[in-house]
Regions:
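Short cysteine-rich clusters marking metal-coordination/redox-active sites
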Residues: 4-7, 22-25, 53-56, 71-74
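Short Cys/His-rich micro-motifs in 6-15 aa windows
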Residues: 26-33, 74-82
């Protein structure tokens, strides 16, 4: 815990002033002038309290040692086990820019459009449970430099003949992608982290544990190599698209560009922490999440459905459907069969899509971080 040099009170990171604030005497301090001394940059570890949920095994870090009363990941109301640990320092951190009040306001605006959501999700006491958590990310810096040799062609028609001319296209490539980011926590769903993006990397600062005071941090347990291929693929896809739209090669149909032709290379991988306001909702064995980007205020929520509200909405929707079916009695038999077939296929498609989506969420089949952890067991 950080203590005020003036009165000994507890210091927390104040989002509004972007400085450390004493809760007792209201004195402000520079986050980089506290606690770690001149050797902070040379110290590769920092001391934290690790809280572990006895139900789901999820872990969060804190510079404070006050007991955490609930788990952000599974929603369980329980006292988390704690221990002191030495954690590896990330290279950079984006401090929280959006306050808890701003987070709650953004969430409330989102909930106005969620007519089938359970009423508990609008309860002020529930919304007040938003917890500020720094999520670990890997930031990849990727370069593409070298000579470029591509095969292109142009097709034209001359009388009864279709003529295809082949060309050898050359050029010099110089591209650089800064900070392609992927979350480094198996507890943080990849889909949520992707939808919360982007973060403005200009807001990154050198890491100091002072920024964690008053907040929590998730543990980093997914290796950078899990996402390195994805980062290089993203860079290659973006470069390929730009080459195709470049005026130099306009009018040419190019063969598929292979990654090795672009000289894609990962130059640097930085460990970072990005701010997320996190809220979980537990109903029996189901857990849903609402998250807010702590820098931009973007809301990403997996909002559950209240069966009673949904049933009422379905009954109201049944009225125009009944009218449609009544009108269908006047259709020709062939038209009626075709309409019924199309509606049936649409229903089957929606049902299958939802089944696959639920299965992927339950098993984490499309989450690279979770699959990585499972492969280690």
């Amino acid at each position: 815990m950080y203590q005020c040099p003036n009165c000994g009170g507890r210091l927390i990171f104040d989002i509004s002033s972007q400085s450390m604030l004493c809760e007792h005497c209201n004195t402000h301090y520079n986050p980089y002038k506290l606690g770690e001394g001149n050797s902070a940059e040379e110290n590769k570890e920092y001391d934290v309290t690790v809280f572990k949920c006895p139900q789901c095994g999820g872990e969060i870090l804190s510079t404070d040692n006050a007991a955490a009363g609930f788990c952000s990941f599974c929603g369980a109301s329980t006292i988390l086990y704690s221990r002191i640990s030495h954690e590896k320092r990330p290279n950079y951190i984006i401090p929280f820019q959006k306050t808890k009040e701003q987070c709650k306001e953004a969430y409330a605006r989102r909930m106005k459009h969620s007519i089938f959501a359970p009423k508990e999700l609008r309860d002020p006491s529930y919304i007040d449970s938003f917890r500020g958590i720094y999520m670990p990310y890997w930031a990849f810096y990727i370069s593409q430099k070298g000579s470029l040799s591509l095969n292109g062609k142009k097709t034209s028609r001359r009388g009864d003949y279709i003529i295809t001319d082949h060309y050898a296209l050359t050029g010099d490539l110089d591209a650089y992608y800064k900070g392609l980011s992927y979350d480094a926590s198996s507890s943080f769903d990849d889909n949520i982290s992707e939808e919360l993006a982007p973060y403005n990397l200009k807001g990154m600062k050198a890491f100091t544990p002072a920024y964690l005071s008053g907040f929590y941090a998730d543990t980093s347990d997914v290796d950078a190599k899990v996402y390195q291929g994805d980062a290089e693929y993203t860079a290659s896809a973006e470069t390929t698209e730009r080459i195709a739209s470049d005026g130099t090669f306009a009018g040419f149909t190019m063969d598929t560009i292979r990654p090795e032709q672009l000289h894609t290379k990962t130059e640097t991988i930085d460990s970072t922490m990005f701010p997320v306001w996190f809220l979980s909702y537990r109903k029996k064995d189901r857990v849903a999440y609402a998250t807010v980007n702590g820098q931009t205020g973007l809301v990403v929520a997996d909002i559950p459905i209240d069966p009673k509200r949904y049933l009422l909405g379905s009954l109201l929707l049944a009225i125009p459907i009944f009218a449609l079916l009544a009108w269908s009695a006047f259709l020709q038999p062939s038209s009626l069969v075709m309409t019924t077939l199309l509606l049936s296929l649409l229903s089957i498609g929606v049902y299958c899509y939802e089944c696959v989506s639920i299965h992927q969420k339950d098993t984490g089949a499309n989450d690279r971080g979770k699959m990585f952890i499972k492969s280690k067991k």
